[in-house]
Amino acid sequence: PTPTHLNYTLFHPVGVCALISPWNVPFMTSTWKVAPCLAFGNTAVLKMSELSPMSAARLGELALEAGIPPGVLNLVHGYGKEAGEPLVRHKDVRAVSFTGSTLTGNRIVQAAGLKKFSMELGGKSPFVIFDDADFERALDAAVFMIFSNNGERCTAGSRILVQQSIYAKFVDRFVERAKKIRVGDPLDEQTIVGPMISKAHLAKVRHYIELGSKEGASLLCGGLAQPDLPERVKRGNYVLPTVFADVDNRMQIAQDEIFGPVACLIPFKDEAHAIALANDIQYGLSSYVWTESVGRAHRVAAAIEAGMCFVN
């Protein structure tokens, strides 16, 4: 305010929002989109991946049970061309929220026109471990961030950059841990890595494993070998936790988002080298830094070109 004027900003609901969620963590990403959308007074049309429709259907049932009026949260099922694209292009849709692949995200931006939109797209996140890091905690986190959820996560720490002085030790311990990961029935609570989402995606992951060996990276475990599975799931889309060491950051397996349990271990010399490797990528979704130095943590986090940086 001023002596003669009162200025303020007034926020209004935008209207109908198209919310497009992926298959890898379908319930969580749906709730992340739906909750703030409805809380601010908008209505939502939720379109799930055709590969994971059931959790959204259950979310719709729960919404009705909770008393959300009919028509406030709406569900659309189908393929992108038949369901997603018409939704994005519809004249009554005022905003679009999409989580998924970079390729599809580019298409949505083109189709959305002047609508408001938010995107969370692909990633090839650097997981940087300096030689002063808490080794055991960094090892635990590195294993978790690439192999949990089958490696099918956009924030997976798939490029593991390790300082040369601890690189050999880290490789040995990381491979030891990877070999112990239980692969099998997703309904078994002891299972860590379950099946890939589809046969097409399994073929993609296996293609990159073959490519890594052809490019000259050292395959230390996993690969194309078939896991020992219970009879009930033998026909599933399984791939073993796979570790490539001595990866050159220019290799395709280091540059492309594989979206599976495939780790690329890359040595670095010093802080400047680590930052250069971390930023030598087309993606910039997330990053991870492990160090006991507060100053280094702030420097590296600021220098890495990523939307999120998690320290220790």
Please name every model-derived segment.
Residues 43-45, 219, 308:
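A short hydrophobic/small-residue beta-strand
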Residues 95, 103-248, 272, 277, ...:
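ALDH superfamily catalytic-core signature
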Residues 261:
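Glycine-rich nucleotide-phosphate-binding loops and adjacent flexible coil segments
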Residues 1-137, 268:
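Rossmann-like NAD(P) dinucleotide-binding subdomain of oxidoreductase/dehydrogenase enzymes
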Residues 32-34, 208, 296:
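Conserved sugar-transfer catalytic core signal across GT-A, GT-B, and GT-C glycosyltransferases
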Residues 131, 198, 264-269, 290:
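A structural signal for short, well-ordered beta-strand elements
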